[in-house]
């Protein structure tokens, strides 16, 4: 089974190598592809990834010059992915890499198109999420629940940046996602109009490995 992991980056040079060191052992279980989608970072993230890719053939760099934005980076990475399954996660270390296997196994073993890692699942752990950001996420999730198809009413984290999906059935929807919209996962659910079979798994959300969050002033 081929698994593509999409990592959008912007100035994550201090975080990307520690994260990759935890993801690369997945090669023992999957035909692994890791796509780092970099928005022309000023801190040398792309150059560092390019050097790492010389030692790890499963690693690919997509360097975006003149294009920017988290949602568009996710979309570009997913459309370029070659796996049967794909997983999107943050590149700053706040998403626990151990959750990758949990999400992918749930996707494989269940009859699902999409598996969401939820920060607000009853078994989730949140460490390092600012009070402002947690409050904003709670508000945004409440609003999202009322705006999406009722089939998704049982989900707890529509704003999650951690999710796994089956590429082939979801590909037409990915192409239709508005990258200028709210959040990528939310927009994907919106364009699906209730057609996706979705499950959630608990997510451990932890402090950044290095640097400061770019989202503390946002509602994510």
Where are these regions (language model features)?
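Acceptor/aglycone-binding surface of glycosyltransferases and processive sugar-polymer synthases
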Residues: 62-80, 85, 97-182, 208-220
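Catalytic donor-sugar/metal-binding loop of nucleotide-sugar-dependent glycosyltransferases
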Residues: 153, 177-180, 189-206
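Cell-envelope/extracellular polymer assembly enzymes that use nucleotide-activated donors
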Residues: 2-4, 33, 187
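Short, well-formed alpha-helical segments that are part of the catalytic scaffolds
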Residues: 12-27
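Short beta-strand/loop segment that forms part of the nucleotide-sugar
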Residues: 30-41, 62-64
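A conserved acidic beta->alpha catalytic loop
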Residues: 38-47, 93
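Acidic helix N-cap motif at the loop->helix transition within catalytic regions
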Residues: 14-18, 43-52
């Amino acid at each position: 089974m081929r698994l593509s992991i999409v990592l959008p980056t912007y100035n994550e040079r201090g975080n990307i190598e520690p994260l990759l060191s935890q993801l690369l052992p997945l090669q023992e279980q999957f035909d692994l592809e890791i796509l780092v989608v970099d928005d022309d970072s000023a801190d040398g993230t792309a150059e560092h990834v390019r050097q790492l890719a010389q030692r790890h053939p499963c690693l690919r760099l997509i360097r975006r010059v003149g294009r920017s934005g988290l949602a568009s980076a996710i979309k570009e990475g997913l459309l370029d992915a070659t796996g049967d399954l794909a997983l999107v996660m943050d590149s700053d270390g706040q998403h626990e890499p151990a959750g990758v296997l949990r999400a992918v196994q749930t996707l494989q073993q269940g009859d699902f198109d999409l598996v969401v890692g939820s920060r607000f699942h009853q078994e989730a752990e949140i460490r390092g999420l600012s009070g402002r950001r947690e409050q904003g996420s709670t508000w945004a999730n409440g609003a999202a629940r009322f705006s999406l198809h009722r089939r998704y009413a049982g989900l707890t984290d529509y704003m999650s940046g951690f999710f796994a999906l089956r590429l082939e059935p979801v590909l037409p929807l990915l192409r239709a996602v508005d990258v200028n919209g709210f959040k990528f996962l939310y927009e994907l659910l919106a364009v699906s109009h209730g057609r996706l079979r979705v499950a959630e798994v608990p997510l451990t959300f932890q402090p950044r490995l290095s640097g400061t969050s770019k989202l503390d002033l946002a509602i994510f």
